[in-house]
């Protein structure tokens, strides 16, 4: 099933023609309406008319988050304030926020993109969509809401938190699509079981569209088992559009990028050169339909890759892999680059361990120390010292084998690690001077 079949199944040649037309229009548009881009193009000695093929996008300069902060509040807007119908901003705690404006057309495009993936998840206008992302300046809640309303669904705008009420509504109203973060979906599953529910039998939810944080395959399976549904990973970021830039279909084999709205590149974050399809690198997006806050070659810092080939679902848009991490949340442990998602992939292989974990960084003098705290499942015999020691040793062995670095493992009892109703805090940095 498709929401916009003609667009979602375009021939590659037709899509390339559409992208080129929109890219050429975009470069002229930002040159004429955003002084930052006029100055940036002039400095790079590139003019809008120099863009003759899609490959010419590599001639255009990158845009980074600091550029948006420096432009606070309105300098990256391409339209007058009278045409801005909504503003979203990043949740950063240092410096100026990164602000993104939306026109009516921008919001319609956003709604259409998200609606495509509700349909891909098996939803329809008959669906009851429970939105448990946060509402506000964060794009998650309103993005999912926008997509559900575009499709004609019934929306329950729960926002995040109030988990008991969340579970009650999910049960009583028979919600069939859940939208939230992976860690919160896991928390809902655990809490529902604690309240005496058997989610696979007691709930009508058939799919969860989860985003805003990485979700390993192991964590996906745990959520699916606890809630009795299918998990689809959705991708977005506030600077580009919020959730709906890309999402999995029911094949769960890569996230389809809405390529009629975005051009995606994967680059080596060190050399800034493109990498071949299938190779991991940093995702870079160009927004080719946005009116208020268009972006040229925006460096996301998100690590992914292009999944080669065409998906069996019939959608022809290229796919990216699930986000492995960010270049700025990468840990360097004794010279080895490690992403939290790599650790998650290892620990979720153990039946005795849940997907809840926290990485604690401490320091003594010039030496950094890394401790991984993981929780056991409720029925693990925590008081049997030999079993506990054996499991600790086995997890440490697997981590070293996969990461090529030793990590101290601390196994804690169930419900020890704080739960999050939004994005999970996976790294606790207690190092001196941090």
Model-derived features with residue positions:
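Nucleotide 5′-phosphate-binding alpha/beta core
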Residues: 1-89, 94-112, 116-120, 124, ...
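AMP-binding/adenylate-forming catalytic core of the ANL superfamily
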Residues: 178, 289-403, 422
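Conserved active-site and cofactor/substrate-binding residues in soluble primary-metabolism enzymes
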Residues: 85, 105, 109, 183, ...
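Flexible loop/turn segments at secondary-structure boundaries
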Residues: 138, 216, 241, 291-293, ...
């Amino acid at each position: 099933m498709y929401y916009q079949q003609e667009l979602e199944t375009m021939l590659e040649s037709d899509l390339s023609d559409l992208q080129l037309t929109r890219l050429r229009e975009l470069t002229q548009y930002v040159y004429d309406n955003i002084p930052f881009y006029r100055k940036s193009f002039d400095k790079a000695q590139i003019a809008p008319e120099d863009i003759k093929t899609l490959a010419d996008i590599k001639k255009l300069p990158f845009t980074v988050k600091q550029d948006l902060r420096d432009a606070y509040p309105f300098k990256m807007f391409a339209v007058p304030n009278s045409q801005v119908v909504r503003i979203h901003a990043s949740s950063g705690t240092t410096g100026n926020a990164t602000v993104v404006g939306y026109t009516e057309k921008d919001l319609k495009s956003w709604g259409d993109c998200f609606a495509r993936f509700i349909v891909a998840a098996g939803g329809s206008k008959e669906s009851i969509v429970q939105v448990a992302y946060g509402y506000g300046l964060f794009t998650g809640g309103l993005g999912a809401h926008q997509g559900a309303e575009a499709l004609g669904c019934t929306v329950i705008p729960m926002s995040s938190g109030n988990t008991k009420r969340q579970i009650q509504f999910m049960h009583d109203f028979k919600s069939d699509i859940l939208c939230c973060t992976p860690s919160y979906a896991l928390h809902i599953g655990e809490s529902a079981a604690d309240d005496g529910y058997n989610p696979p039998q007691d709930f009508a939810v058939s799919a969860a569209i989860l985003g805003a944080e990485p979700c390993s395959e192991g964590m996906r399976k745990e959520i699916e088992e606890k809630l009795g549904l299918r998990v689809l990973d959705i991708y977005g970021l506030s600077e580009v559009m919020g959730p709906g830039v890309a999402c999995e279909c029911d094949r769960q084999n890569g996230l389809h990028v809405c390529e009629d709205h975005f051009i995606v590149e994967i680059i080596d974050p060190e050399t800034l050169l493109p990498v071949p399809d299938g190779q991991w690198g940093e995702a870079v997006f160009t927004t080719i339909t946005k009116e208020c806050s268009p972006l040229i070659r925006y460096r996301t810092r998100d690590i992914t890759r292009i999944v080669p080939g065409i998906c069996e679902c019939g959608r022809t848009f290229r796919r990216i892999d699930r986000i492995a991490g960010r270049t700025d949340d990468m840990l360097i442990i004794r010279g080895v680059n490690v992403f939290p998602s790599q650790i998650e992939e290892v620990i979720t292989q153990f039946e005795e361990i849940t997907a809840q974990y926290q990485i604690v960084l401490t320091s003594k003098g010039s030496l950094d120390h890394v401790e991984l705290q993981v929780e056991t499942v409720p029925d693990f015999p925590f008081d049997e010292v030999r079993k506990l020691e054996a499991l600790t040793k086995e997890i440490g062995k697997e981590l070293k084998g996969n990461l090529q670095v030793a990590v101290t493992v601390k196994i804690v009892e169930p419900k020890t690690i704080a739960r999050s109703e939004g994005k999970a805090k996976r790294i606790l940095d207690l190092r001196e001077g941090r």
